[in-house]
Structures are given as structure tokens and as C-alpha cells.
């Protein structure tokens, strides 16, 4: 058949009027329901059994259809028709792993763009959308199942999502199982969990168990459930148990009760090594799962006379304070305190009779800085010397990153006019060794350091003393602990800050600063190097303490005037930008040490007799 156009009038010829050419006109036509009309026509073809060009062969039925519809809806069929496959030329494909009901349901969706997902058919749709690679339908099934996750079906959905490759459903189901782990691990479905999924469960920090011992019991129970086929996995699963967080007694019992299984799977030596680790370095591992620990804010203050000490702790969960027994911590003027695992480290300071108050301490004519490092073990209430730093220092800061203690800035032994130290050192608590790392880009005074993942941010001033004492916050450094590289950031604060009146804290891997002079909180965006205002708190004393825990910032104590010191504690909830007051400290304090520390519940020395 040949179609021809009558060219008696040339539509593209520009007409003239009185010698003046008229403008050429055009209209752009858009039919908004064009796609739906095409689908309706194709569905009519299907109902009338016309223009079919392909067949799906089932075990008990042959279903005719149109290639264009299959290819438009399914990546499986599109790939089949694009490449030189036998089915393309034969005009048919045989499918054996889907039922006729499933294929017809898929075709109904493909021709109409509509279907109804229910509890009864969602698994069928999930299976066919996975096999036929219908992404929109697969996501709809995944979203439907995510909303239905509960204690009864979560393990089944975890298995289904793993089989069908639904990352979103798998992540949601995995999170649910991890959160309710202690309620699920005794079920028969749990014992049927495949190795890969169990491994994923166990490696998470968020695994909700009352103690790490439960994780070890789960691994042994799962292995014994089908010992012949599963014992090969035991070494891999044992690695996911944080054995160094267990008590020596628990590990010894495991050796005694499971000796045969452990030896046959080459796991006996793993437990033996863990026992040696606990004996030599117990409490020096910061990787305890949050659900197995109690978290505290540790407060310590030595008065100017060097004799009166105040030490107490705040239990995050119970909002209660406890006055701690005398620890006799040697916190020299200008020293720095950091927590690591279940231990507290004190570095440096001045051995002479320097003033403890910062503004008076910096004015001393001579600083007899020390290189000593002390470790305090609250579990044993023991305070002892460890390896000395390479360089004596005072008025520095210390912070933990990559399981090492870093000491940054400050001044070494000498007269008041010596410059700030550029040398930076790191200490490995397990090997008990100090090493030098890359130096600071330039000198910094009043350093504040915070760690966000493996990056240390350091803020401070480039000058030590100004006429008004309060030097400006004009130094901002970034240290990548993984690559041992420093970089200097542009301090785009948007306003003036005093270096001695800000506190830097990390919250959920984000750096925040609290300005104690304006009562405002700012967060830092590492991509743009810009500080964003996050809100204001009611008030805060100068020289207050500030701590970041999970999604919260705690601001504690401080002074409004030399004779007006406060015991107030305020909490900023970063996830909802709200402030609240919590229980006040047992005593009003200013210029004190403030750190977060956590203990395994089974050896928590501060848990009992908490009092406000």
C-alpha cells in the first residue's frame, strides 16, 4: 500500500500580504493521556486476541502477548529481545519457575499499569518481579512488606529479601531483627537463618543484646543445630563475637564446655588469645555494643589549692548523679584528660605551682611542663603511670581517633614567651607506645579538638594573649588520622567567636560548636566549610563543660561571674533542635574535666546506689 500527499498547497511556503511576509506559525501538541490511551488500545488488542507476536509457554498453558508490552515493562524480556537469543527468533519462551496465575497477574499489570497488592499475593508478585526484573513492581512489594514487618514475620522477610535481592527490604528487616535480637534468637526460624545473613546480623554495633555473652551462645547454638554442614562457618562467626568484651570466666567456661567443637574447627586458639587479651588489656577496647554498656559523663575538678577534689558521674539513662570515691587523680595545671574504652588518660601539665585557672595559668613566667601520662581505671579505682610522651607539654588538648590517643598543641617546658608546639604525638594503649605524627600546619593556642569518624578537627587562636584576653577563634585545622595529613580550613563562621568561649563536640559524626557567650549552637558542613546555626540554649556559664553523646549535646556548669558558679545541666537534642534541663550536678563547678565513658554492664563500678 502506498500513501501519497497532495502537494497542491505548500504549507511551509511563507505567504505575503501587500508585499509584507507573514510570520510562520506552529503549534506544539501534547496529549497528556497519550500513554494511557496506548495502553488501553494494547489491552483491547489483548482482549480481541489480535496482533499477537509472542507466546509464553507454561507447564499447563500457552499465553499469547505482544513483545512491545513485555519489553517496555520487563528488563528480562527487553534483554531477551535485544540480544540474539533463541527465544527472540522462535517467538516464544518457556517459563517453569512461575505459575500461570503469576504470569497472568504480571500481564494484567503490564497492559494496564494497575494491580492490587495484598497479604495473599505479595510474595507471588515479589517473586515474579524479581525474576522478570520489573523494578517498579518490585519496589511496591518491598514497600508493602516493610510496613508489615513484625516479630512473627521479620525472619522470613529477611530471608525473602536476601533471596530476591531487595536491598531496601533487607536493610529494614535486618535492622528490625537486630533491634529485637534477644527475643528472636531462640525461635526455630532463627536457627534456619543462612550463614551470610547471620554474619550480617552479628557484625553490627546496633545488635541489641544485654551482654556480649549472648552473641557467643547464639553462634554456638546455630552451629550445633546442623553441625555437619555448619561447623565450617564457626571460625567466621566467632570473629564477629567481641570476645575481648567478655569476662575471663566466661571465656574459660567456653573452653571447658566446648573443647571438642572448638578444637575441631580451629577455634580453640582464638578463645585462648581472647583470654590473654582480657588478662593483659581488659577495658581498653572501645568497641562494646551500646546495648551492653552503661554510659556516663565523668566530671573531675581539683581546686586551686591542689587538695580539694570533686569527682562525680552522671548516668545518661537514669538521669542521676553519683559522687565517686576519692580517686587521687594527679591532674596537674594545664594537663589534658581523655577517656578510652573503660579507662581515663591524663597527659602532661605543669609540675610547678602554676595557677589552674586558664587566664592566670598562661601568665605564669615559667612552665615546668611534664611528659608524664597517667591512666585511671575506675573499675579498680587504680591510678598509674604509663609510657611518657616524647615531648613535655602543657595547655594542650587530647582526643581519641583510630584507637589511639592524640596530643595536640600546647607549650613545652620553658619561659612564657616560647611558641606553641607544632609537634603532634599519638599513643597506642595496647602497645603502650608513643609515636610522632605529622605536625600542625602552624601554632595554635587554646586548642579544642573533636573526632568525627577518623577525622580530628582542631579549633583555636593564632595568638595567646590580647588586650582583652579573649583572643579570637581564627584557627581551624583538619587532621585525617588514616592518611596522617593535616589541612587548614577557612573558618567561615559568619560571626566573631572568642577562642576561650567555645566548646567543640561531635554528635553523630557531625562537628558542633557551642558559643558560651551568645548561647548559640552551630554545626559544620565539611563539604562547604560553612557553619550553620542550629538554635539557642537558655543560658550557660563561661568555662562550662560540653559533651556530645549519641544525638545530644550536654552543657554543664560554668560561671556567670567569679562568685556566681552554676550546677545547671542543659541538653540539646540535635535531631529535633530542642533544649531541656536535666538533673543538676551535685556541686556547682567551673573549669573542670568532662568526658564520656562507658562500661560493660557486668563490670560497671558506678551502677549501684546512684543518687541525685
From Swiss-Prot:
Residues covered by the BACK domain: 154-254
Bilayer-crossing regions: none
Keyword Repeat appears in the UniProt entry: yes
Family annotation (InterPro entries): BACK, BTB-kelch_protein, BTB/POZ_dom, BTB/POZ_KBTBD3, KBTBD3_BACK, Kelch-typ_b-propeller, Kelch_1, SKP1/BTB/POZ_sf
One GO cellular component term noted in the UniProt record for this chain: cytoplasm
Keywords associated with the record: Kelch repeat, Repeat
CDD domains, A to Z: BACK_KBTBD3, BTB_POZ_KBTBD3_BKLHD3
PANTHER family given in the database record: KELCH PROTEIN, KELCH REPEAT AND BTB DOMAIN-CONTAINING PROTEIN 3
Protein name: Kelch repeat and BTB domain-containing protein 3
All copies of domain BTB, residue ranges: 52-119
GO molecular function, one term: ubiquitin-like ligase-substrate adaptor activity
GO biological process terms on file: proteasome-mediated ubiquitin-dependent protein catabolic process
The Kelch repeat ranges on this chain: 295-341, 343-403, 404-454, 456-506, 552-599
